[in-house]
Amino acid sequence: MNKVENRAERFFQQMQGKRVAFCGIGGSNLPLIKIFAQRGAVVSARDRRGYQQVQQAAELEKMGVRLVLGDGYLQDLTEEVVFRTPGMPYHLPELDAARRRGAAVTSEMEVFMDLCPCKVYGVTGSDGKTTTTTILARMLAAAGKKVHLGGNIGRPLLPDIWQIGPDDVAVVELSSFQLTMMTCRPHVAVITNVAPNHLDWHTDMAEYTDAKRNIVRYQQASDRAVLNADNTITQGFSEGLRSDVFRFSRLHEVERGTYLGQDGTLYGRDGGE
C-alpha cells in the first residue's frame, strides 16, 4: 500500500463507528453514502423528498443506512460529521446548530481536495467556468496526463480517490456554493470573472465575492493564480496573495500571462517581452 492509499485508508478508518449525516441524497452524495456505510460509519441519509422519490432508498436501507425524509429531514442533526450537498446554504439554522454542538460540517469536494494525491486545477467564475474547465481538462489530456474531471461538472471524485496517482491531475469546476467556507486550495486556480450571480442564495454581493476569493485565499508560494485582468473584482483578488499570479486579457497587454493583441494574435508573457 503506497502513501496515497495510506492517507485515504487512514481517513476512512477514522470514520469507522462515527455518526455521519449526508444532507441530500443526490448525485454528489449518493456514492459517498454507500462508501461510508461500507467502510463502517454509522450513516444517516437525509432528504426533503419522500421515500418513493429518493433514488435507491430500499438499497440504502439494506446497507444499514438510516433514512430521514420529508420536510423535517434536518431536524435532530446530532451526527458527528455532516456532509452538505453543494447547493445547500452553508448557514442554514440546522447546520449552524450542528456546528455549535461540535459537528464537522463539510462537503465531498472539501474532503477530496484534502486527500487528493495529485495536482489540482480549480476553475471558478460567474461565466464560462464549465467551458474553461472542459478545455483545460482536454488540453492536459492531450499533453499525456491522466485527468480526473469533477466538482460542479462530471461526477464526485472522492469515490475514485484510490485510483488517483500522484502523477495524475484533477481538474475541478468550483461553484460559489462549493467554495463557501472552503479552506483547501487548488495548486492552480483560474477565475474567469466575478459578476452579480446567485444573490438569492448568498446574503449579498460581498458574500458571493468572498466565496469566489476562497479559491485563491489559501494558496502558497508554489501555487499559481490565473486572474481576469479585464474584471475589476478579480483584479482585486491579487492583493495579498502568496501564490504566483498570472493574468489574461482581451483588452490590453499584461506583464505575465496571456493577452489578445490588436492584430488578433494571442500573446503570452512570463514577466518579459
What spans do the regions from the language model cover?
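N-terminal leader/targeting and accessory segments in enzymes
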Residues: 1-107
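Short, acidic/polar N-cap/turn motifs at the starts of alpha helices
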Residues: 10, 57, 176, 255-257, ...
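Adenine nucleotide phosphate-binding catalytic loops in nucleotide-utilizing enzymes
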Residues: 14, 18, 23-25, 85, ...
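Cofactor-binding loop segments of dinucleotide-utilizing enzymes, especially the Rossmann-like FAD-
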Residues: 25, 48, 125-126, 152, ...
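Short linear Ser/Thr-Pro motifs
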Residues: 28, 44, 85, 126, ...
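Short beta-strand "acidic-cap" motif of Rossmann-like dinucleotide-binding folds
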Residues: 42-47, 149, 171, 247
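Phosphate-binding loop of NTP-binding sites
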Residues: 74-77, 86-229, 233-244, 259
